[in-house]
Swiss-Prot record:
EC number, as in UniProt: 3.2.2.-, 4.2.99.18
Role of this protein: DNA repair enzyme that is part of the base excision repair (BER) pathway; protects from oxidative damage by removing the major product of DNA oxidation, 8-oxoguanine (GO), from single- and double-stranded DNA substrates.
Reaction catalysis annotation: 2'-deoxyribonucleotide-(2'-deoxyribose 5'-phosphate)-2'-deoxyribonucleotide-DNA = a 3'-end 2'-deoxyribonucleotide-(2,3-dehydro-2,3-deoxyribose 5'-phosphate)-DNA + a 5'-end 5'-phospho-2'-deoxyribonucleoside-DNA + H(+)
Keywords: DNA damage, DNA excision, DNA repair, Hydrolase, Lyase
Record's protein name: N-glycosylase/DNA lyase
Annotated 8-oxoguanine binding sites: 26, 53, 64, 148, 174, 210, 214
Coiled coil spans: none
Domain of life: Archaea
One Gene Ontology biological process: base-excision repair
Record region (Helix-hairpin-helix): 120-184
Signal peptide: none
GO MF entries: class I DNA-(apurinic or apyrimidinic site) endonuclease activity; oxidized base lesion DNA N-glycosylase activity
Active site: residue positions: 144, 176
Length: 242
């Protein structure tokens, strides 16, 4: 565990930021949508889309690109109605459509009250958005969809406000099947607890640690990164037994 803490500390928040912005195809999809959508609606759509990004029928990256292309240049009066048209035709997200539309209906009332300035306020205090979504959606604090939504909101806000704010340390890692599988090789502890400890000891918040692990699981192209960061990620790959 000490070696794991040291390598993540060596990568740091800045290294995680570089991975997010140069390797994560979801980040590229959001940059594309931002260029073709109103900034306020862009962020609201990203929140809504994150809340229905589960039980996919395709790869996550493909789903986010499908979303970005669909809403590019599209005028949206009601997010719920827009998804009522989008999801049934979607290639990468066709399961549990009614349940997903219900989730969007739940959050739309909240989103409709927010201005761009309000959204910027939530970016400055992402913990506040996390707590608000937990209450609105009736979810647990460590719900993987809720914490993933905060992560994608952070991406969207970073793009929209041209400013990087690190994720709060208190928000846990999204505990999906891949994270569970990787963690089980390292510890018997619950993944959210284990990575929270690693985060606190390394100084890198769990949502940023998630950004380091995911590309390694999916054999992402790391060539856009500088050689020093690539070497650190290769070392992390070894430590995770990938």
């Amino acid at each position: 565990m000490r070696e794991l803490v040291e390598i993540i500390k060596g990568i740091g928040i800045e290294g995680a930021k570089e991975v997010e912005e140069k390797v994560d195809r979801q980040f590229y999809a959001l940059q594309y949508l931002f260029r073709h959508q109103d900034p306020e609606m862009f962020i609201k759509l990203v929140i809504a889309n994150s809340l229905v990004s589960y039980q996919l029928t395709g790869r996550g990256e493909d789903w986010w690109w499908e979303f970005a292309r669909y809403f590019s240049g599209r005028e949206v009066d009601s997010i719920w109605k827009a998804y009522g048209e989008f999801l049934p035709k979607s290639k990468n997200n066709r399961r549990l459509i009614e349940a997903k539309l219900n989730r969007i209906r739940k959050v739309e009332g909240f989103l409709s009250t927010l201005t761009l300035k309000d959204l910027e306020g939530y970016y400055k205090n992402m913990k506040m958005l996390w707590k608000a979504l937990i209450k609105i959606m009736g979810s647990r604090e460590d719900s993987k969809t809720i914490v993933f939504t905060v992560k994608m909101f952070g991406y969207a806000s970073r793009i929209a406000f041209s400013r990087f704010i690190p994720y709060p340390m208190e928000i846990p890692i999204p505990e999906d099947l891949r994270i569970k599988s990787v963690t089980s090789k390292l510890t018997q502890e619950k993944p959210t607890k284990f990575w929270m400890k690693i985060g606190q000891e390394s100084g890198v918040p769990p949502l940023h640690i998630d950004s380091l692990i995911w590309p390694l699981l999916g054999n992402a192209d790391l060539t856009p990164l500088d050689i020093e960061l690539r070497n650190k990620l290769m070392k992390l790959t070894e430590l995770l037994g990938l």
